[in-house]
Curated annotation (Swiss-Prot):
GTPase-activating protein for p21-rac and a phorbol ester receptor. Involved in the assembly of neuronal locomotor circuits as a direct effector of EPHA4 in axon guidance. One of its GO terms (molecular function) is GTPase activator activity. Interacts with EPHA4; effector of EPHA4 in axon guidance linking EPHA4 activation to RAC1 regulation. It comes from Homo sapiens. The modification Phosphothreonine is found at T192, T340. Pfam families: C1_1, RhoGAP, SH2. This is N-chimaerin. The modification N-acetylalanine is found at A2.
């Protein structure tokens, strides 16, 4: 049975925007120009990149070799002051350099000159290439979509319950009508929800502080990458919201202080998550797959059929709030499609997709090859480009999907159908062009289909 396109799995633009991340990857790398002779009176906090009292013209000649080249010189006009000379954009840039225990040319302080130059090259490159893009970052925020407030809301099955005043008659009622009144269905609960129950009861200004993020991080207001090595943005000290400095001015006053101890699972970089929890794979992947395999392998349309979106959001909230203690058992979520939906949502919300932007072209290339042996060889080479945590998670997922296909007679899901569902979920084109991304969907589907069919060979 072949499926063409599912209503619930049509192409959707990714939540997290990769353009600035791609630019950071492309930025020139630092290249230290060392002095070949001993320089008298060299400050102890500089290394062989210090060339003494040389002119701007002499520095320019030394740096002409490559983009990213740098050296430090002492000013001829103002002895005792120092200049960082840096090659960028085919010209030499000169910055007054300071040291107070750390190196700096502006607000940011660095432990080493190398880190200062690396961060500077990233900033110069991104601001040169994407000045207009950066100026418009705050125009279409995703803040309401990510919804930090959803982490603290009541679950769907609770928040729709009306506030009922208990009466003496209600407590003593044993008749069928009394039981029915107290056990309102979820549909009736939704119908009785009052509009004012959805309005926040108070406002609180976020307590933003400049923050250095370890590992890749994305702004939770505009969904763009937070570039640089240190002080890439600001973090709310009370609720943990991470945003660009310029985006912090646009965030509404909706800080929830009781979220400060929450460690997010969804929308967190995969490698960062597994390192933080010291696990081989993200807990949400392991727990969802175990639950699906324990009671859902024979479910018709597994992964194709959508679950109720409010309850999928509840599962996401449970993982973000409770981590590995999240209850996703049949007692909480009888419909297995809620769990499959939560797993697909986890992969869709990854800032860097499971099949990363760097590896994406190689995977697409493999799907276009007609010779089966060459195709598998290229696919094997593509897998080597994945970070270890991504590769291990992909291996585990493909082994699971292979087991799903063994129950095809019952669930009607073969490798081709699963490829249709998971292709755009696990892979996202690094290209900004929507048409190019749409054209790649058929190859994305084929990549996943090949990974499932050849799981035992490739992994």
């Amino acid at each position: 049975m072949a499926l063409t396109l599912f209503d619930t799995d049509e192409y959707r633009p990714p939540v997290w925007k990769s353009y600035l991340y791609q630019l950071q990857q492309e930025a020139p790398h630092p290249r230290r120009i060392t002095c070949t002779c001993e320089v008298e009176n060299r400050p102890k906090y500089y290394g062989r990149e210090f060339h003494g009292m040389i002119s701007r013209e002499a520095a320019d000649q030394l740096l002409i070799v490559a983009e990213g080249s740098y050296l430090i010189r002492e000013s001829q006009r103002q002895p005792g002051t120092y200049t960082l000379a840096l090659r960028f954009g085919s010209q030499t840039r000169n910055f007054r350099l300071y040291y107070d225990g750390k190196h700096f040319v502006g607000e940011k302080r660095f432990e080493s000159i190398h880190d200062l130059v690396t961060d500077g090259l990233i900033t110069l490159y991104i601001e040169t290439k994407a000045a207009e893009y950066i100026a418009k970052m705050t125009i279409n925020p995703i803040y309401e979509h990510v919804g930090y407030t959803t982490l603290n809301r009541e679950p769907a099955y609770k928040k729709h319950m009306p506030v009922l005043k208990e009466t003496h008659d209600e407590r003593d009622s044993t008749g069928q009508d009394g039981v029915s009144e107290k056990r309102l269905t979820s549909l009736v609960r939704r119908a009785t929800l009052k509009e004012n129950e959805q309005i926040p009861k108070y406002e609180k200004i976020h307590n933003f502080k400049v923050h250095t993020f370890r590992g890749p991080h994305w702004c939770e207001y505009c969904a763009n990458f937070m570039w640089g090595l240190i002080a890439q943005g600001v973090k709310c000290a009370d609720c943990g919201l991470n945003v660009h400095k310029q985006c912090s001015k646009m965030v509404p006053n909706d800080c929830k202080p009781d979220l400060k101890h929450v460690k997010k699972v969804y929308s967190c970089d995969l490698t960062t998550l597994v390192k933080a929890h010291t696990t081989k794979r993200p807990m949400v992947v392991d727990m969802c797959i175990r639950e699906i395999e324990s009671r859902g392998l024979n479910s018709e349309g597994l992964y194709r059929v959508s679950g109720f979106s409010d309850l999928i959001e509840d599962v996401k909230m449970a993982f973000d709030r409770d981590g590995e203690k999240a209850d996703i058992s049949v007692n909480m979520y009888e419909d297995i499609n809620i769990i499959t939906g939560a797993l697909k949502l986890y992969f869709r919300d990854l800032p860097i997709p499971l099949i990363t932007y760097d590896a994406y072209p190689k995977f697409i290339e493999s799907a276009k090859i007609m010779d089966p042996d060459e195709q598998l060889e290229t696919l094997h080479e593509a897998l080597k480009l994945l970070p270890p945590a991504h590769c291990e998670t992909l291996r585990y997922l493909m082994a699971h999907l292979k087991r799903v296909t063994l129950h095809e007679k019952e669930n009607l899901m073969n490798a081709e159908n699963l490829g249709i569902v998971f292709g755009p979920t696990l892979m996202r084109s690094p290209e900004l062009d929507a048409m190019a991304a749409l054209n790649d969907i058929r190859y994305q589907r084929l990549v996943v289909e090949l990974l499932i069919k050849n799981e035992d060979i490739l992994f």
